[in-house]
Amino acid sequence: MNRLEVQGQVFELSPLRYTPSGVAVLEFLLSHEAEVIEAGQPRRLAFTLAVVAMGDLAQMALTTSLGCTVRIQGFLAPVRKDSQKFRLHAQQIQQI
């Protein structure tokens, strides 16, 4: 199973673009900060995650402004074939 849910602030929005077949694509960065418990100890997390939304979801995500808090559900995939870098492919985006 490859499923991820994360909440954070929209940090950077790229311009809307289209694939050669006409599918809308919106890429953005999500800034996440949280405290979790690991091995019984608190651990502070702060990271930026690359996100891509496609199709109708990309059009909907255009209404999201910088700094807006969102909850995203989706899956991780390599940025390109054989890459060690991953990004979150959004399947649901909810503004908080």
PLM feature segments, named:
Residues 1-96:
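Single-stranded nucleic acid-binding surfaces, predominantly the OB-fold ssDNA-binding core
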